C-alpha cells in the first residue's frame, strides 16, 4: 500500500494557514457593539482565545473553534494535533472543556475514506485524553484536507482569563518550547531528521491542561496560547488589550531541539514574514534571527502565562505538578512607545 503523506495535499500547514493579523483586523472590523449582549463577557474586542457567555450562576460557558490543513503526514497524528490545538483555547481562558464537535473537509476524489477515518480517530483520542466526548460534527468535500474542532467549555467567572487582565508588574512564562513552524517547514523541504520531527509532534500533541489550574491561582492574571501569529503576535495582543508593554529576554526563550540548525538552512515558513509585516511596527528593532524565531507560527503551542512578581512561589509549585520547570522569558512594564522590546 502506498504511503500517504498528507502534507503533500495542502498548500499550508497547521496554524501557519491563518490569515495574517493585519488582514484579519480588516475583515473583522465592525460597528456593531457587543454591549447589545450584556451576558457576553468576552467577545472579539480584545482578540481573546474563546468567547465567554455568563450563565448567571457564577460560571460562563466558553465557545471556540480552530481548524487547519495537515501539518504532519500521518493521518491519526494530524487529527490528534488539530484537536489538541482547538482544546487549548479553552484551557487558555482558564476553563475546562465539556464536549467538542468536529469540522472536517476532505478531498474525496483524492484520499480514501479509511485515511479520513484515521484523522477523526486522532481527534477523538485527543478528546478522550481531555476527558470529553467528540459528540458529532460536520463534513464537506473540499480541495484540501481540513480538520479541527468546535469546543464548548465552562469556567468560574472569577477564574476567567482575559487578554485585558494583565498588569505592568508581571513575569511572562511560556509552557512549551517554540520553533514548530521552522521544524515543519524543514519537514516539507525534506531536511528534517526523524528525531527532531518526533519532538515537535510530541509537543503539539500535549494538552495545555495546566491552564485550568493556573487560572485558580491569585498570582496568575491572564494567559493566552501561542499559535499562528507567533510569540510576538500573541504577546502584543495581551499587551494592547491591557494597556501595557513587555520586555522579552530573547536568550531565555526555550527552543525545540535543532531549531537553530534548520533556521540557518533557510527553513523559514512564509507566515513568519506575514506575521512581522502585520505587527512589526509595534516591536523594537530586532535581528533577522530574532524575527524568524519570535514570529514563527506555532501549532498547538504553549501558554503564555502572566504571573505577578509577588506571587511566584505558588505558580512554580503548580507548574512542577505538571512536570513544567519554567523560568520567566520576560516581564511586563508600563506602556511605552514600542509594545514589545526584545532584549
Curated annotation (Swiss-Prot):
InterPro entries: PurM-like_C_dom (IPR010918), PurM-like_C_sf (IPR036676), PurM-like_N (IPR016188), PurM-like_N_sf (IPR036921), SelD_I (IPR023061), SPS/SelD (IPR004536). One of its GO terms (cellular component) is cytoplasm. It comes from the Bacteria. GO terms for biological process: selenocysteine biosynthetic process. The record marks 18 as: Important for catalytic activity. Homodimer. Synthesizes selenophosphate from selenide and ATP. This is Selenide, water dikinase. It comes from Sulfurimonas denitrificans (strain ATCC 33889 / DSM 1251) (Thiomicrospira denitrificans (strain ATCC 33889 / DSM 1251)). The lineage of its organism: Bacteria, Pseudomonadati, Campylobacterota, Epsilonproteobacteria, Campylobacterales.
Amino acid at each position: 500500500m502506498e504511503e500517504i503523506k498528507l502534507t503533500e495535499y495542502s498548500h499550508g500547514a497547521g496554524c501557519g494557514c491563518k490569515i495574517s493579523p493585519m488582514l484579519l483586523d480588516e475583515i473583522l472590523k465592525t460597528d456593531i457593539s457587543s454591549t447589545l449582549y450584556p451576558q457576553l463577557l468576552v467577545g472579539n474586542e480584545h482578540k481573546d482565545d474563546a468567547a465567554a457567555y455568563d450563565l448567571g450562576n457564577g460560571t460562563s460557558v466558553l465557545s471556540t473553534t480552530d481548524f487547519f490543513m495537515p501539518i504532519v503526514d500521518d493521518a491519526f497524528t494530524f487529527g490528534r494535533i488539530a484537536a489538541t490545538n482547538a482544546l487549548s483555547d479553552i484551557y487558555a481562558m482558564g476553563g475546562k472543556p465539556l464536549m467538542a464537535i468536529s469540522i472536517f473537509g476532505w478531498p474525496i476524489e483524492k484520499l480514501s475514506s479509511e485515511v479520513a477515518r484515521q484523522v477523526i480517530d486522532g481527534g477523538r483520542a485527543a478528546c478522550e485524553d481531555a476527558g470529553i466526548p467528540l459528540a458529532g460534527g460536520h463534513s464537506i468535500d473540499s480541495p484540501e484536507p481540513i480538520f479541527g474542532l468546535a469546543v464548548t467549555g465552562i469556567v468560574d467567572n472569577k477564574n476567567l482569563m482575559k487578554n485585558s487582565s494583565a498588569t505592568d508588574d508581571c513575569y511572562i512564562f511560556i509552557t512549551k518550547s517554540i520553533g514548530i513552524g521552522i521544524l515543519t517547514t524543514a519537514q516539507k523541504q525534506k531536511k528534517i531528521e526523524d528525531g527532531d520531527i518526533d519532538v515537535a509532534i510530541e509537543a503539539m500533541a500535549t494538552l495545555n491542561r495546566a491552564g485550568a489550574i493556573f487560572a485558580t491561582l491569585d498570582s496568575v492574571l491572564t494567559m493566552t496560547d501561542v499559535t499562528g501569529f507567533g510569540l510576538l503576535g500573541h504577546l502584543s495582543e495581551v499587551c494592547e488589550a491591557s494597556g501595557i508593554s513587555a520586555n522579552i529576554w530573547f536568550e531565555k526563550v526555550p527552543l525545540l531541539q535543532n531549531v537553530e540548525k534548520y533556521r540557518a538552512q533557510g527553513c523559514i515558513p512564509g507566515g513568519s514574514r506575514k506575521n512581522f509585516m502585520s505587527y512589526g511596527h509595534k516591536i523594537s528593532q530586532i535581528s533577522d534571527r530574532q524575527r524568524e524565531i519570535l514570529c514563527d507560527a506555532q501549532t498547538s503551542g504553549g501558554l503564555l502565562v502572566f504571573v505577578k512578581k509577588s506571587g511566584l512561589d505558588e505558580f512554580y509549585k503548580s507548574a512542577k505538578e505538571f512536570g513544567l520547570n519554567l523560568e520567566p522569558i520576560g516581564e511586563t512594564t508600563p506602556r511605552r512607545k514600542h509594545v514589545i522590546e526584545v532584549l
